[in-house]
Every structure is written in C-alpha cells, then in structure tokens.
Amino acid sequence: MTLPRRPFPGAPGIHRKPHDRRRLWAVSTALLSVLLVGVLALKSSGTSDSNPSANSPQCRPTKLLVPRCGAWFGAYVRHSKPDLEKNVLAYEKRIGRTLDIVYTYHDMSLGGLEGQLLTEQEQRVGKKRMLLLSWESKRWNGTPAEQPRWSQIAAGALDKSVIDVQAGRIKAYGKPLFLSFDLEMDTRTPASGTPAEYVAAYRHIHDRFRELGVTNVVWTWIITGYTGHSELFRGLYPGDAYVDWIGYNQYNYYRCHKAQWQSFAQTQTASHDWIRENISAGKPLMLSEFGTADEPSKPSAQAEWYEQVPRVVKRLEGVHAALQWNFRDPGPGCDLSLARDESWKSLRKAVADPYFNQVGPGS
C-alpha cells in the first residue's frame, strides 16, 4: 500500500506566560495568625491538589472515547494485514504495556483485505484495544482511472458497492471505534477534488452511516497540521456536527526533508494552537501520528526527544490521544521508527506515565 507523504512545518517553540504572583507587602500579626489557622484547618480536612485516580468514576471515558483525566497512547505498527496481532504484541512487549489505540489503513477496493474494514486480525486486536481505522478513497492497486473521486462519493456512486458494505461491517462489530475518512486530505486537493467536494463526500458517508443505523463510529478528522495549509484546512473542515475528534500528524523529519532538528514541543505546538484558534476551541484533539527521525551522529538524540512527550502532551490543552508512528516515510533519511534500544527504553518510560494510563471503555 502507498502511504501519504507528509509536509512539515517550521513550527516555533512554545512560549508560556509565567503565572501571576501576588506579593503581600504587609501583614499584621493578627491577620497572619488567622491565615495560619486556616492553613491548618485545610490540611486537617484532607484537601489535596493531587490528580484523581484513573480508576475513579470521574475519570471514566465519555461515549465519544474521551478520557477525562489524561490521554490514550497508541501507535501505527508496521504490518501486513495477516500479521497485525503478532506485530502489535511484539511492539507492546518492547514498550511494556498494552496499546490503547491501534492504527490501521484501508482503501476502497472491492476485494481482498485492504478494502475490508475490520479484518479478522483487527477484530482480534480490538478485543482489548480501541481501533483507529484510516479509510482512504483510493484503490491502491488500481489504475488512475479507477481511483474514486470525492464528487462520486458525495453523489452516492459508491454507496452500494463500498459505503454500505463497510458500514454493515462496522455496525456488526458493535464496539466504538475511531474512523477517519481521507486523512491528510489537504495533500490530495485538487487531485481528488475541491475542498467543497471533500466536505460533501465526508458528510455523505457520515449521513449514510447514520441512515443505516451505525452508531459506534467516533468521527475523526485528521489533517497534516502543516501550517502552510491553513486556508485549505478552513475549507476542508466538515463542521462540528460531523466531527467528534480532530487529529493532526506532525514529525521531526530532520534529514528526511533537510529540515532543522525540532523538539517534540516544536513539532506539535504551532498546529495545536492554530486548530484551537481557527477550527475548534473545544473538540478533543489527537496527535494521530508523531515521531522523529534518528540522528546517527548523536545516538541519544531520539531517546531525548521521546522523553519530552508526557510533559508536552500534558500542557497541550485538549490533547487526549497520542499515537507514535513506528515506520518510515518514502525517501532517504525518512525512517521515523525507533532506531535503537535507547530509544525504545525512552518511549517505554514516557508511556508508563500515569497520564497515559487511563481506564479504557467498558473496563
């Protein structure tokens, strides 16, 4: 299968304002005594600023799979359709935990496993994990003339042969899952159609699923996050009524695109802030693909990059899922997978953080 090439932004770093501090210039002895009594009373009453346990009722995920007290951790693990479970288990062994979300791709071909949402392997993996299915309006082994266009999808031309069939499979699966239609669609216009045609196609699939009684889809709109495409993003957004989560895919490409080395914070912050200011102030956000190239001249660089992940995700308001991309992109220097044991150990430590260990749906 062919995976999309991802543009990269020149994202600036994070600039955080210091918290305001109040200074007390004069306090009488009597007032100080009152304050001390109040502090002691608070301590004795058990008041605490500590975060609630992931097992507490207030931290249970919502119907739209939003963890209330932290974030999910997931990954795209390199696989072919028949060996998904084996490769997921091998990845989990190295990071020391079960993935919350497993990320897979599908096209709209009419035969074989590539066009079949929820393969037997995905259903096996999905017993203990959530799934993010990336559904692309492509036929990876087809000719240019066979590639679906957004206008065709919007007009219902693929309903009987593709849309209805896959809707039925998802409905039969029953469990909630994340579904993305044409992730990184900002790289596919005008080849697949106009932004307006994409929106019409997305809405048609959404509405068709609803007509067919499919209620277990969490609709996930995923863009590159490349800030140079900001005007495209505005025109490609299907609207709040059609989107449950917003995702974006940003990397430290480094030598892959002859870019400067960027920290995890630098790769994520500009896109996050732009989405919050221009697309949605309240939708849950997903770092649907993140990762970094290696730096052979500094073997510790990749490990140090992953060390930042928990700290940065916690301060990116509204980010409730982060998925590591453990594969390569096309081109020289574009291997974004974990390169050495030190990198694996760093990621293992990062995803052991309690923030990434929330109670799953149905637990």
Task: Describe the role of every protein-language-model region.
Residues 117-136, 251-293:
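Glycoside hydrolase catalytic-domain groove-lining segments
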Residues 89-97, 115-133, 165-174, 235-241, ...:
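Acidic (Asp/Glu)-rich catalytic clusters
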Residues 111-221:
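Substrate-binding cleft of extracellular glycoside hydrolase catalytic domains
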Residues 56, 62-79, 177, 284-363:
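Substrate-binding cleft of secreted/luminal carbohydrate-active enzymes
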Residues 59, 64-158, 292, 324:
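N-terminal substrate-binding region of glycoside hydrolase catalytic domains
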Residues 37-59:
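C-terminal region of N-terminal signal peptides and the immediate post-cleavage residues
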